[in-house]
């Protein structure tokens, strides 16, 4: 009897040892196969490399994150408000304490004095080169000037919308705009943009690709240019790259934490003629006062109504970061 029990025990022990050996052998074999496969893939990746030289690359990478509209009755209790105004406003008011006075007046509307920031800019052209909107809510004041009407419209179009942008190398490639939301945005001290549309044989339509003097000039010595050409047609571009940077951009939608207030002028600037601007923007309005004190008093009175037409965002627009986004 004892011999049978010992024999059974030895059989179980040998079976366990044999099963363990088989498992280890299978594990080593699988490790070998996996490591060999990874080695082959690694070596192959060194010799097989792909680079996209296409001229119509997808525009990718957004620095803006959408947030839902605030539903709080008093968002100003935990928010910041930036008020952008031209230098002429401070010059006309000529009072060293004017911002403190306005801060106290904003306090009567529920805005703590530490939540209001006054940001000065020289003029529309200068502001166009580097607009920076850092607060939860941003109100930009623009004094109407008939000679700068188009510049004001372009600036409003830029800051009232979110854009996705990629760099353009106009010296090597030709480009096309895929749809109405696709624009070329140029910024710099002096931007002159010329274009030459191409046919399917890449020959110039009404211009010579080898002679930039035959190109159509769409902008001359401007600081901000939003260029719109015929969609689906390749274009050769000539840009003053030493003083200007151009990007291939796609309009994503409204930047809802920004409002533009036009000061004076017979008509309010309208950027809704652009088919991509839908619905009609409520964040562009006009104040008809001659004196800047009157302008600021009106803004204080209606600041909460203005903010209710906006949407709080926790991100900012820095045109340098936004514009060089790849």
UniProtKB/Swiss-Prot annotation:
Protein family per UniProt: Belongs to the rotavirus VP7 family.
Region (CNP motif): 165-167
Binding site for Ca(2+) 1: 95, 206, 214, 216
Originating species: Rotavirus A (isolate RVA/Human/Thailand/Mc35/1992/G10P11[14]) (RV-A)
Glycosylation sites: 69, 145
Binding site residues for Ca(2+) 2: 177, 228-229, 231, 301
Region spans: LVD motif: 237-239
Entry GO MF terms: metal ion binding
Subunit relationships: Homotrimer; disulfide-linked. 2 Ca(2+) ions bound at each subunit interface in the trimer hold the trimer together. Interacts with the intermediate capsid protein VP6. Interacts with the outer capsid protein VP5*.
Localization (cell): Virion; Host endoplasmic reticulum lumen
Signal sequence interval, chain numbering: 1-50
Lineage per the UniProt record: Viruses, Riboviria, Orthornavirae, Duplornaviricota, Resentoviricetes
GPR motif: region residues: 253-255
A GO-annotated cellular component: viral outer capsid
Disulfide bonds: 82-135, 165-249, 191-244, 196-207
Other known facts: Some rotavirus strains are neuraminidase-sensitive and require sialic acid to attach to the cell surface. Some rotavirus strains are integrin-dependent. Some rotavirus strains depend on ganglioside for their entry into the host cell. Hsp70 also seems to be involved in the entry of some strains. In group A rotaviruses, VP7 defines the G serotype.
This protein's name: Outer capsid glycoprotein VP7
Modification note: N-glycosylated. The N-terminus is blocked possibly by pyroglutamic acid.
Role played: Calcium-binding protein that interacts with rotavirus cell receptors once the initial attachment by VP4 has been achieved. Rotavirus attachment and entry into the host cell probably involves multiple sequential contacts between the outer capsid proteins VP4 and VP7, and the cell receptors. Following entry into the host cell, low intracellular or intravesicular Ca(2+) concentration probably causes the calcium-stabilized VP7 trimers to dissociate from the virion. This step is probably necessary for the membrane-disrupting entry step and the release of VP4, which is locked onto the virion by VP7.
Keywords recorded for this protein, A-Z: Calcium, Capsid protein, Disulfide bond, Glycoprotein, Host endoplasmic reticulum, Host-virus interaction, Metal-binding, Outer capsid protein, Signal, T=13 icosahedral capsid protein, Virion
